[in-house]
């Protein structure tokens, strides 16, 4: 079963990873593994944002079409 991802949880985890890496107290392999996890999370977050952006764009364009049709009827 695939894990369901949550934007806020992923963002919080990414912030934790960045904080840990910035401290610089890890061995190379640990740093690499955290960096890799951070990149994977970052890609997921970007994908989620693009999906939401697309949905918002669709909603806005649908709303504009409705408003335009209403204005046509009032003419």
Curated annotation (Swiss-Prot):
Source species: Caldanaerobacter subterraneus subsp. tengcongensis (strain DSM 15242 / JCM 11007 / NBRC 100824 / MB4) (Thermoanaerobacter tengcongensis)
Superkingdom to which the source organism belongs: Bacteria
Gene3D superfamilies the record matches: Exonuclease VII, small subunit
Entry protein name: Exodeoxyribonuclease 7 small subunit
Localization of this protein: Cytoplasm
Keyword Cytoplasm recorded: yes
Top-level class of the enzyme under EC nomenclature: hydrolase
Pfam families membership: Exonuc_VII_S
EC number in record: 3.1.11.6
GO biological process, one term: DNA catabolic process
């Amino acid at each position: 079963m695939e894990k369901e991802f949550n934007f806020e949880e992923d963002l919080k985890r990414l912030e934790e990873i960045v904080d840990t890496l910035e401290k610089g107290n890890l061995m190379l392999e640990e740093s690499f593994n955290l960096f890799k996890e951070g990149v994977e999370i970052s890609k997921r977050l970007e994908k989620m944002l693009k999906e939401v952006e697309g949905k918002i764009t669709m909603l806005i364009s649908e709303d504009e079409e409705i408003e335009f049709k209403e204005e046509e009827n009032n003419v």
